[in-house]
């Protein structure tokens, strides 16, 4: 009852602006990926990233290299991204098997959408849906299985794209439209794929290289536009990319072919997230939100650091025209001067539930606008991956892994040379509370913080920044220690050091967020 009264009091005190908003259904496939070319970054790193913004598994493991003495076959699965553990089978089904050549696979980090291997090949992902008529469930591959095979077998982005294209042609693609942001230590590519339609087990895809001095963004909408397939250094596509569009009536063969328009079927090639991020990195371009499409990439007006990508993935548009709390203001009286000011209510937060937003808008239409934020509370995990051509693979590639809301959680460094993760990483936290699952180590404090975000925000932000600074500050030291151990004791000992560092860093973040949770419980001891 107190909670309901609090909401009503907040609503009554709000200073509203006009303009009713209808809230759309939450896209269950929502994700965001930012790419940075090596000449656009502050230190020459190639960067890719991913926010996995839905009810996907939170368990993560590092899969070791597998030695195949002879040619054989390996199984391909569906829905492994919903399993409760590495050995679990909940909702998972066997789709078939494919040829596996003799030889060794590469070690890789097995997130719901596998993200990095030991050779500094890395991937981000966003579901771009596309036309329903293109989906053929008889195709063998879901996108995450393509990623897994590519990370096990490939060391460069181009090779990964070629291999996935070959697998799609031979075995078929059975998923909705997907985008992968595929990076290695030299370059990053924007790859989009769709099914070939109900009558064909195959697929259609295109890939565009992000210029070295540019950045790109994918956020659940097809983005690839025109294709210059004569420029083999910067464009790749399936052989049927034009044929399928004409056959299915998506392109008349006369107007300029735009991949996003043919296969996506939408009216625009971007959303608020692409617009906000690109506009923030290249404001002088004057990008227009009401345009039909934006450039796939832009040249940033300053060098972009790994830390800035982390910050962009934490965006809630605070202070901008897209700020969803901008109308939720209350009058505050200064106790000393008696002056009255209006401020954002401490009870307002960017992640208000649908019920809360609907209540506020029922009391006064237009109280809360609806924009899809970059950082959302339903995020399972997120990645920012930096790759360096001037460093050995073991320490050149770093996955900065976060769980739960990217705007509220710390990031844990996992190096290419890290060979295992603490036990708490292996337990999914999506099917109930489990104190042993790493996501719940952060989720408790994060969710409590939103009860009165105005009072807790600074504490969360300070903790996030502390570990961001710690990771950046210690990165050079860790690499130096690795090199010293490598020279004195060999690679196995050096990798053990990296593995221990990841575990220690994770432990420090867990303790900090457990302390925050206790602090917030004390803060709200008398009620919310």
Positions of the model-derived regions?
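Histidine-centered catalytic/metal-binding microenvironments
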Residues: 468-528
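Glycine-rich, aromatic-lined ligand/substrate-binding cores of catalytic
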Residues: 246-390, 394-395
């Amino acid at each position: 009852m107190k909670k309901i009264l609090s909401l009503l009091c907040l609503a009554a005190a709000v200073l509203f602006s006009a303009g009713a908003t209808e809230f759309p259904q939450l896209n269950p496939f929502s994700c965001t990926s930012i790419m940075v070319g090596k000449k656009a970054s502050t230190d020459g790193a190639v960067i890719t990233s991913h926010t996995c913004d839905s009810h996907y598994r939170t368990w993560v493991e590092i899969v070791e290299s597998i030695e195949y003495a002879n040619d054989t076959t390996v199984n391909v699965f569906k829905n492994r991204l919903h399993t409760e553990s590495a050995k679990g089978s909940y909702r998972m089904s066997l789709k078939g098997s494919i040829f596996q050549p003799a030889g060794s696979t590469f070690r890789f980090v097995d997130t719901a959408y596998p993200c990095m291997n030991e050779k500094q090949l890395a991937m981000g992902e966003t579901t771009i849906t596309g036309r329903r008529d293109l989906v053929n469930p008889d195709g063998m591959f879901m996108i995450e299985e393509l990623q897994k095979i590519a990370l096990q077998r490939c060391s460069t982005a181009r090779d990964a794209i070629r291999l996935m294209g070959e697998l799609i042609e031979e075995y078929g693609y059975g998923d909705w439209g997907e985008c992968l942001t595929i990076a290695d230590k030299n370059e990053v590519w924007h790859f989009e794929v769709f099914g070939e339609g109900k009558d064909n087990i195959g697929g259609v895809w295109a890939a565009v290289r992000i210029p070295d001095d540019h950045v790109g963004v994918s956020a659940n909408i097809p983005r690839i536009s025109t294709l210059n397939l004569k420029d083999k250094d910067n464009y790749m596509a399936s052989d049927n990319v034009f044929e399928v569009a004409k056959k299915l009536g998506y392109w008349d063969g006369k107007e300029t072919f735009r991949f996003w328009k043919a296969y996506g079927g939408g009216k625009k090639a971007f959303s608020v997230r692409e617009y906000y991020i690109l506009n923030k990195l290249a404001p002088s371009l004057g990008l227009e939100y009401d345009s039909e499409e934006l450039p796939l990439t832009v040249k940033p007006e300053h060098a972009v650091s790994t830390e800035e990508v982390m910050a962009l993935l934490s965006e809630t548009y605070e202070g901008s025209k897209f700020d969803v709390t901008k109308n939720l203001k209350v009058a505050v009286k200064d106790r000393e001067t008696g002056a009255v000011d209006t401020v954002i209510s401490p009870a307002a937060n960017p992640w208000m539930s649908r019920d809360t937003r609907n209540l506020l808008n029922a009391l006064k239409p237009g109280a809360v606008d609806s924009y899809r934020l970059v950082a959302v509370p339903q995020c399972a995990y997120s990645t920012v991956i930096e790759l360096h051509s001037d460093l050995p693979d073991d320490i050149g590639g770093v996955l900065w892994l976060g769980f739960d809301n990217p705007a509220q959680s710390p990031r844990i460094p996992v190096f290419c040379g890290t060979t295992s993760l603490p036990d708490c990483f292996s337990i999914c936290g999506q099917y109930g509370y489990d104190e042993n699952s790493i996501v719940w180590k952060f989720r408790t404090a994060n969710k409590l913080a939103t009860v009165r975000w105005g009072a807790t925000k600074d504490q969360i932000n300070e903790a996030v920044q502390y570990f961001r600074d710690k990771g950046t500050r210690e990165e050079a030291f860790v690499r130096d220690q690795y090199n010293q151990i490598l020279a004195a004791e060999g690679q196995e000992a050096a990798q053990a050091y990296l593995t221990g560092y990841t575990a220690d860093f994770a432990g420090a973040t867990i303790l900090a967020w457990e302390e925050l949770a206790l602090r917030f419980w004390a803060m709200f001891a008398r009620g919310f």
